[in-house]
Amino acid sequence: MIEMDISKDAFESYSAEDTELGLDLDKVKGVLKLAGSGETIKMEQDDSTGKLVFKVGNITRRMSLIDTTGMNDPKVPQLNLTATIIVPIEELQKGIRAVESISDHITLKAGPEFFELSCEGDTDSVSLKLDNGAAKISTDTDVCSMFPPEYLANIIKAIPGGTQVDIELDNDYPVKLVFALADGAAKVSYLLAPRIESE
């Protein structure tokens, strides 16, 4: 699950009334890929057709909206997770690159003096361990949860370089990853369910 809170200050210009739009995110992703680094994307709703119009340079894309009638708003779980770790995204990205393809799960552990991302397969194992000098750790007890590597990797790889990531963790609970974009004008929160091993 992902939740984004974007203020108008994150945009070069912004004008809108209260409204609800249903978007096909795969189509939106395709439009965003058309933009080069630093290129401006203009997005506006065409009142005559009801479509969302994207302009990227000389390209114009008109996109049909999804009818949201009857769609339930996803409820974001309110979790009070025990451990909070603030770590540079570069450390997480190195750890993910190291553990990929070793096992079908990644273990995240944290204690008062450490944060660890590890993975153990049939023949190989690897871990990234950070102390309080490399990460800001806040927890009174040790916590541990396992997660599917492909989903966690996709989240971590999508976070821009130079970003500080707030990781909230507990025993066999979802992990929450929170980070800011656009000089703090936008906040992104990812929530990933744990992998629970059957006894």
Can you name each region flagged by the protein language model?
Residues M1-S101, K109-E199:
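DNA polymerase sliding clamps and clamp-related checkpoint/processivity subunits
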